[in-house]
From Swiss-Prot:
Source organism per UniProt: Aethionema cordifolium
Key words of the record: Chloroplast, Membrane, NAD, NADP, Plastid, Plastoquinone, Quinone, Thylakoid, Translocase, Transmembrane, Transmembrane helix
Signal sequence bounds: none
GO cellular component, one term: chloroplast thylakoid membrane
Transmembrane parts of this sequence: 30-50, 98-118, 127-147, 165-185, 203-223, 253-273, 297-317, 340-360
Compartments where found: Plastid, Chloroplast thylakoid membrane
The name this protein goes by in its record: NAD(P)H-quinone oxidoreductase subunit 1, chloroplastic
Length: 360
């Protein structure tokens, strides 16, 4: 069989075209993940700057102002400083657990962002069980904190790790029961379906009005999961120095610092998605679906802006709560979770189930 030169060139060009298609496929596959990571990093930097500015205003002081315009680059400067600091390891601790703990906490929180719909058709992974996936992934983070406390070979670190695990278990159950109530109202476990179910009746169709008790319980439980005041028992400075972070320095300490803000941001995003209508505008005579049908790019941009606006509104509430309420004792924290929030969330679930079964 004789192959002419033109046929060889055709075969070579076809091979190059197929290789280019594979490269383009890889690029388009990683582009959404890269965009999400860039967006998360930017969101955390803005969140840190907002907390410092709001905290400064509450305490009647100036706050950061030298690193960039209005001090907006102060968080980036702190991150670079921690990046070049020495990583110390406890001489008698378990170095494996000590090193894995921070990474496990950060990775488990980052994976939770994959099920967040930032706008219509703008979600990294639209699973049918997206809510359960978030609960399962978020349950891994306390394991990393417990590993960090145990691997540090320090009594304060170990007590902080135990407190983090106990606190997470105590408030994970009421939070899950609230999510089940939302899924019953929406007839779905998908975050996208939950947002679309709230878009039928506009502003009054938000789950905030249909589940006010569940919203309050979810708000309290999410603050406890984020270990924010008044629930910052695992790292109480007056009692445990810095809790499970006591022996950490450098980039590992920075990972814990980032993890706390990542957790706060993901909790606020879930409040927006589950209770505040997600990307829906909820204004009279303006429909989100009409915007997407007219101009998909403009509609997606507006949806992202609305989602982030609702998210940062909730973050403002979380930040002001930090400087308003006093820290609870450990026994008060556990009693509040097991004896108060759990029965109320269970009753709310039973009431929601009754309404759905009898179509009241």
């Amino acid at each position: 069989m004789i192959i002419f030169a033109t046929e060889v060139q055709t075969i070579n060009s076809f091979v190059r075209l197929e290789s280019f298609k594979e490269v383009y496929g890889l690029i388009w596959g990683f582009l959404p993940i890269f965009s999400l990571v860039v967006g998360i990093v930017t969101g955390v930097l803005v969140l840190v700057w907002l907390e410092r500015e709001i905290s400064a205003r509450i305490q009647q002081r100036i706050g950061p102002e030298y690193a960039g315009a209005l001090g907006i680059l102060q968080a980036l400067a702190d991150g670079i400083k921690l990046l070049f600091k020495e990583n110390l390891r406890p001489s008698r601790g378990n170095t494996t657990l000590f090193s894995i703990g921070p990474s496990l906490a950060v990775i488990s929180i980052l994976l939770s962002y994959s099920v967040i719909p930032f706008s219509n058709h703008l979600v990294l992974a639209d699973f049918n069980i997206g809510i359960f996936l978030w609960i399962a992934i978020s349950s891994i983070a306390p394991i990393g904190l417990l590993m960090s406390g145990y691997g540090s070979n320090n009594k304060y670190s170990f007590l902080g790790g135990l407190r983090a695990a106990a606190q997470s278990i105590s408030y994970e159950i009421p939070l899950t029961l609230c999510l089940l109530s939302i899924s019953l109202l929406s007839n779905s476990l998908s975050t996208v379906d939950i947002v679309e179910a709230q878009s039928k009746y506009g502003f009054w169709g938000w789950n905030l009005w249909r589940q006010p008790i569940g919203f309050i319980i979810f708000l309290i439980s999410s603050l406890a999961e984020c270990e924010r005041l008044p629930f910052d028992l695992p790292e109480a400075e007056e009692e445990l120095v810095a809790g499970y972070q006591t022996e950490y320095s450098g980039i590992k300490f920075g990972l814990f610092y980032v993890a706390s803000y990542l957790n706060l941001l993901i909790s606020s995003l879930f409040v927006t998605v589950l209770y505040l209508g997600g990307w829906n505008i909820s204004l009279p005579y303006i429909s989100s679906l009409e915007l997407f049908e007219r101009d998909p790019i403009f509609g997606t941009t507006i949806g992202i802006f609305i989602t982030l606006a609702k998210t940062y509104l909730f973050l403002f509430i979380s930040i002001t709560t930090r400087w308003t309420l006093l820290r609870l004792r450990m026994d008060q924290l556990l009693n509040f979770g097991w004896k108060f929030l759990l029965p109320i969330s269970l009753g709310n679930l039973l009431l929601t189930t009754s309404f759905q079964v009898f179509s009241l």
